[in-house]
Structure formats: C-alpha cells, structure tokens
C-alpha cells in the first residue's frame, strides 16, 4: 500500500497522524475543529470533501480544494452558494441522498427539490412532523412518505460525528 510510506514521510516531516478505530477521517476533523473552537481558536480545514462544509461556523472555515477551483467557505459563503446554513447542508443531503457515501435519501427528490424543501422548512424532522400541513405538491409528499425511514437514516449517516475519542488538546498539534 502507498499509505504506509506516506504516513512515515508525514511523521518525519513533523505532522501528527490521528486515527481512531470505528471513526472516519471526517469525524476526526470535526472533533478537532470543535476542540479548536472550544479553545477560542479559529480553524481552517483544507479538504476536497464537500461533506466538511457542514462544519463551517463563525470560527471554522473550509478551504474546498479541487482541480477546477479553490473556495474558502464561511457561513456567509455557504448561504450565498446554497441558500442554507452549514448545518442545513446535512438536511439537504438526507433528502437528496449521496451514492458516493451510500446515503439513500428520498427516492425521486434530487438536489434542487431537496434544497427547496430545506430552504422552506429547515430540517428533515420538521418536514416529517408537519408532512400533512406542508404546502408541497402531492407527488413530493408521496415520495417523502414512501422514503421516511431512508430520510431519517440518511440524516443520521450524513452528519459528521464531532465527538470522536481522540486527543483534543490543541497544543499537541502545533
């Protein structure tokens, strides 16, 4: 595997490697970002993974790197780009799903439909608690009803766990 020589090189260069059995890299990043915030520090996460955008806050920004462009996301930039708050990105993903992360979502509702629902109603929980009262098309209501379990599971799967049991002493990473 190419990972072992890379890990060795990063260690020799003075970088600290953090792993945690049963947790994904996103969870570790989220946990460390939360620790930075709790210590009054600002945090910038450099990644190519859009899932990290849910971690954006007043103290944490995400530098999303790709072949096409690099964008620094702040809460304002996410609102401008997606029309929702960073935490609401989790809700959108729960409805639209994400095949790359094995998140099923609601069958038949894509990014635009999911974005519209969350811009209006903000959370999956609210949508299902008020499904009969929402001003939505019957077809959308039927899709939501048929995929309720998937949507709730997708909401849980899509949220980064910011409580991974890793060393959160920020001083140990400087």
Describe each model-derived feature in a short phrase:
Residues 1-168:
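Extended two-metal-dependent nuclease catalytic cores across DNA- and RNA-processing enzymes
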Residues 172-174:
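Cytoplasmic/organellar membrane-interface segments at the starts of transmembrane helices
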């Amino acid at each position: 595997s190419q990972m072992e020589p890379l890990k060795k090189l990063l260690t020799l260069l003075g970088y600290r490697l953090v792993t945690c059995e049963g947790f994904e890299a996103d969870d570790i990043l989220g946990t460390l970002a939360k620790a930075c915030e709790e210590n009054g520090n600002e945090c910038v996460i450099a990644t190519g993974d859009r899932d990290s955008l849910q971690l954006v806050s007043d103290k944490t920004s995400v530098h999303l790197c790709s072949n096409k462009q690099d964008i620094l996301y702040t809460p304002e930039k996410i609102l401008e780009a997606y029309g929702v708050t960073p935490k609401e990105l989790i809700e959108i993903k729960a409805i639209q799903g994400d095949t790359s992360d094995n998140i099923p979502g609601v069958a038949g509702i894509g990014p635009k439909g999911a974005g519209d629902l969350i811009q209006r109603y903000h959370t999956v929980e609210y949508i299902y608690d008020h499904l009969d009262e929402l001003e939505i098309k019957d077809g959308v209501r039927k899709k939501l009803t048929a995929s309720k379990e998937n949507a709730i599971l997708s909401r849980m799967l899509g949220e980064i766990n910011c409580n991974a049991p890793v060393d959160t002493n920020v001083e140990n990473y400087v």
